[in-house]
Amino acid sequence: MPRVKGGTVTRARRKKTIKLAKGYFGSKHTLYKVAKQQVMKSGQYAFRDRRQRKRDFRKLWITRINAAARQHDISYSRLMNGLKKAEIDINRKMLSEIAISDDKAFAELVSKAKEALK
């Protein structure tokens, strides 16, 4: 039985890694060994940051809501507590969008939250 060296498989695997490393700086997009390490590290960063992104957006929404709420003389925590007591079920993403785009509607929500707190 003849010996099989597997050259095509090896070349294909290496080409795939180099292709994934496209756009990397220096030898990281040309040398296989370094490219392989960087592609693995990039995957780790991507995995971590997909989770981080969710936290970052939530933080951003809360900051926006707090800024808009303070213009109406109420803190973020009191606003959220008031909305909960008024049984207004609206998520932070939508609330921040309303705060940015529709000040009238946000003012209405704030007034209902203030009423519920009394």
Curated annotation (Swiss-Prot):
PROSITE patterns: RIBOSOMAL_L20. It holds the Pfam family Ribosomal_L20. The keyword NADP does not apply. Keywords: Ribonucleoprotein, Ribosomal protein, RNA-binding, rRNA-binding. One of its GO terms (molecular function) is rRNA binding. InterPro entries: Ribosomal_bL20, RIBOSOMAL_L20_CS, Ribosomal_protein_bL20_C. One of its GO terms (cellular component) is ribosome. Signal peptide: none annotated. GO terms for biological process: ribosomal large subunit assembly; translation. Binds directly to 23S ribosomal RNA and is necessary for the in vitro assembly process of the 50S ribosomal subunit. It is not involved in the protein synthesizing functions of that subunit. HAMAP family: Ribosomal_bL20 (MF_00382). Belongs to the bacterial ribosomal protein bL20 family. This is Large ribosomal subunit protein bL20.
